[in-house]
From Swiss-Prot:
Entry coiled-coil feature ranges: 433-461
Biased composition (Polar residues): 1-23, 569-588
PROSITE patterns, per database record: FH2, GBD_FH3
Family per record: Belongs to the formin homology family. Diaphanous subfamily.
Superkingdom field: Eukaryota
Protein name (database record): Formin-H
DAD domain boundaries: 1013-1051
Domain FH1 as annotated: residue spans: 589-615
Domain GBD/FH3: from-to ranges: 34-394
Organism: Dictyostelium discoideum (Social amoeba)
Pfam family, one: Drf_GBD
Gene: forH
Presence of keyword Coiled coil: yes
Amino acid sequence: MSFDLESNSSGGSTIGRNSSIRLSSGLAPSESTVSLNEIIDLDREFELLLDKLAIEDPIKRKQMQSLPDISKRTLLEQNKADIYRTVKHKGPIESFADVKSVISSINTKHVPIDIIKTLRIHLNTADRDWIQSFLDNDGVQPILNILKRLERNKNRKRKEHSILQWECTRCIAALMKIKIGMEYIASFPQTTNLMVLCLDTPLIKAKTLVLELLAAIAVTDRGHGAVLTSMIYHKEVKKEITRYFNLVQSLKIEKNAEYLTTCMSFINCIISSPSDLPSRIEIRKAFLNLKILKYIENLRADYNEDKNLLTQLDVFEEELSTDEQLNSQQGTQIGIEDLFSQISSRVTGTPSQQELITLMTHFQRMSSSNLGLGVWTLYNALANQLEDELKIHPDLDVTLVSLLFPEVKKSSSGLFGFGSKSKSPSSSPALSSMAKTELKKDNEEKQKTIEHLLKQLNKFSGGQNTERWMIEREEKNKLIAQLMAQTKNGGGGGGGGVGGDSSLSNDEALKRENQLLRMEIENIKNNPSVLLNSGNSINGDVPNLFISSPGSTLSPSPSGEPPIPSTDFGITSSSIHTSTDKLTNSTEPILGSPPPPPPPPMSGGGGPPPPPPPPGGKSNKPAKPIIKPSVKMRNFNWITIPALKVQGTFWDKLDETSFIQSLDKVELESLFSAKAPTVKVESKQLTRKVVVTVIDMKKANNCAIMLQHFKIPNEQLKKMQIMLDEKHFSQENAIYLLQFAPTKEDIEAIKEYQGDQMQLGAAEQYMLTVMDIPKLDSRLKAFIFKQKFEGLVEDLVPDIKAIKAASLELKKSKRLSDILKFILAIGNYVNGSTTRGGAFGFKVLETLPKMRDARSNDNKLSLLHFLAKTLQDRIPEIWNIGAELPHIEHASEVSLNNIISDSSEIKRSIDLIERDFVPMINDPLFAHDKHWIHKITEFQKIAKVQYQRIEKEIDEMNKAFEEITSYFGEPKSTQPDVFFSTINNFLEDLEKAYGEYQAMIRKAELENSKMEDPEKGGLQDLSSQIRSGQLFKDRRVGDSVIAQMQNVDSLRKNLKSTSTTTPNTPPTIKIELPSQSILKPSGQLKK
């Protein structure tokens, strides 16, 4: 029996749907014979198709190859008829068969967002050949051109620009999903330059995607350098303080956990990608200098339940620790300055920073002690002991570590020896030099406090309230007694040497002091003319005590000085100096410190004599005569050198007396007296111009600043505001001048001023010049509105159309309807055993965000993952839902309040022109300005027509939005941005959940099959490794192995050199590998 095959398909080796089998004998053919020939050709063609579709996952290929033959033939026919390459929805680009026509459609000056969205959808589903052709024909460049234009127009921040930027970035992400696209983008420096500039977008999801793409590029061989260069480019273009500044600051500012995770993963990628250690240290140093460790600590506290973010924070710290360990092994190759710099960068901005400063100060102090350079041997021994301890107990709490020094023997009288008066505790041999220093410092501080209290002791700060004065004196005396006792006893404030006798003597002294104080108060009550003044003496050390007679007045002198006391005293000297005498009697003088200052003089002239020198000190130089000015002078806060320290210096034999005589004392006193001297006719003094301000002072000051900004005469400013020439007068200048247009109150205040107009301030002079311009305020407002009208309309109309179109699209979308039906089915099934089951519908805005929160019992999946899987199985074309809802993303960014505000501004401005200028066309008042009046009224007519159209669009928008909210059962008060953003975010999460589900299945299948995925290096593959931290773990393992191999090679070389120098047969040598401790590697040779 013979037969032949005849195919009507375009491919000769493929049996198509219209192929027929004709038998020469008319009998049925042998089934086995036909199947054999079919299978050979069908399998070959189907393998080629799988390669073309870039299906290289072995699990997926196996599933596809197991399809029935009829399904394989259908797929082959669809591919040959170019059905597969045609977009599955109607859009701006009807077919993607011709790659060049697609590229030319986006290579125009004005590209609609819809075209970019359509391209992005196709890039996500196109086969590898199409994407390769797209790249070969330079299809990326038109996308980059769009990003360039958006960056040039960044000053006009429109929502549609941000969305277009976002869609272009998503197109680049779609290209990077496969390896050839990733390699192409990584080797295209212009792409990364434009991508880093997108980090300034207001859309947080766009910033997150950009950082994810940059992170994936940074871990490729050719991409890391491009990303680093682009970050430098970003610093220059955006005028950053330093590189990475904005990036690190975003860790503090942003609150979106997804963004923070991606940002940290990007930082980890650019730090850890270089293979050489110095490069990683240098890059990380820039981040440490920006105090990133402080922000990481805050993120751990604020997001302690976000596993992905915590993983990236762990990666940063683990990479830091690993590189520090490797760096310590190579420490001899690094300069001491670099080591200090690395340590400083490591702790800057952390709580340990102050501890490091204290430690370095301690090192500096100890290196100058008696130990000298031997101190470093001591510290090295301590560090080695601590390192060994951490090896044995890695979880050791370092705050509980104590160093074991030889125990100090204590005498029976206590450590500080309170029973001995001849020895100071600071000189006790039982104390270390450090303890002596600290004790001496403490005593000095207490002595300063005592001296300060002694100076304040005689100050009468209680006014006429003598009881309050007594309380203050008691408290000060008590504190002085305690401090002097502590200083005498060693400053410990306790200890074994403090007995009860000392406390008893202090109590008795205080009782005696109180009795004397009461006697002094009674004396003051009986003689109320006593005045204790708190002013200082000439030398500023001892308070002056002024006493007046009963018949004298207490009013101050005209110069502001205290009244000159009389010689008729009403109080004895013994009662005046009770406090000072009592303190000197109740406590013993301290060796090496001066006694309390002497009492103040009983007369008003001169100051007290200088205090006596300290015991054992040199005598002072003779006191210089005090030259008292005729008026009270201002203070000159210079720092004088004590007389004891002048000897042997430049000042020792210097006599300035002759210079004082040559000074112009009159001029010196007139310039630096405490109060300005009265103006005299004969004095040479510059006359100052009197400036009169009649308007609000704050407004006048701001107006003066504004005039300095323009730096042109008032008449020229007036002319500019009359002409209002758009070529020479900008909108910004008009806004500036509008703030200082003279109001009705300003004009009245200036007109009421009857003085010399030349004495008016700069602000009044300006307003005097321009206030005769009719309706100046309205003119400037009309000019500003005319300048910004076009931008207002360009921003307003697309927003109105987006809400209207998105409302209609949601109502017509069949795919969205199918999704909501499946959600209703799943919800009723899950809640079937509860009162929430059997629902007829659900609140969309409240339910959709909860889909991801409903977790499976193993906490790995959510209802959103299950929904995505179900939709893929039942309605695989559901993922083209974006084609049905092209305006929902734009609508999600629109604020209804902004639409109302902008439209109201247009309405107010049109009414203002119509009210103030349209009736003035024939007004003689505006005869000199007829040209501008004509221009502004003509503009008003055009603007009014456009506004009427906008009003109509707003009415239609409101009607469409009310219908869609009612259609889904949502309240009418719902805001459009809330409504559309909820649905848009849900659809994006749904698509993302499907990708996560596929990745989990793929990972499980690969683990079970023990097969390696041949297609690595795509965006999803790299992002998954980055997020899980596996990419960094693999690198650390590699670095550790390399380091061990290098150490072993070094040991072998040392061993070889040793063996060659020894003439005898070398003994057997056992090599021990270096320790894995992160603190102290201990590679050794054992014989």
